[in-house]
Amino acid sequence: MEENKQQTQPASSRPADGKLYLIPSFLGEDNKSIIPDQVKEMVGTLDEFIVENAKTARRYLRAIGFTKNFDTEVVINEIDKHGENIAPKLLANISKGKNIGIISEAGNPCIADPGHELVRYAHSRGIQVVPLVGPSSILLALIASGMNGQQFTFHGYLPIQSADRMKKLRQLEEIARRHNITQIFMETPFRNDSLVRDALQVLDGDTKLCVACDLTLPTESISTKKVSDWKKQVPDLHKRYSIFLLGG
């Protein structure tokens, strides 16, 4: 009988679940004003974060005016240090009423980074996901390219090996030109030049290529030209953050 008296805590007396906030970051440290004040205010209320790199996340938080003590008041978990099936571990405190923020290394979380797995888990558990407004290099490049903004595909990083990359570029070109679907991709800054060389070698001269570099920064440049025109003046993109788009 004593066991029957022991009941689980009524749902009405449990703390409401917290929320998962998706926090935008800079596209480069030369334009810190790009983060809206509303985002800064919201981030200031949080004390638990999921990040790719703790050091750069702390630097970012300080840059936007975050004042809490990282040693005594804040928990920062690096997503890559928790092995497989990480979402239940990293989001456990949400069920206790705590809000948690995901911070990307650049731009918005969950695009070309591992945060999407956490968001997928959050939805499966009925956790509210709140995306905060911030810069997206992909969308900024698209709207400034002059290419089709109604149908487009983002491919992330193309293959590293040159032969595989050129094959992929030909495939993307075929889709862009036959169906007028803008093809968007990116590369790590130190491989930009090799990607451009492959593109100029394998793509048709009439194919349109947009190169968008250093978006939101003082050194920003965005240009859409035919491949034949790019060949006349090959851009130097070494160590510049770039987005590439192909159009028909």
Residue ranges and their predicted role:
Residues K96-P114:
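Ordered, amphipathic secondary-structure segments that act as subunit-interaction surfaces
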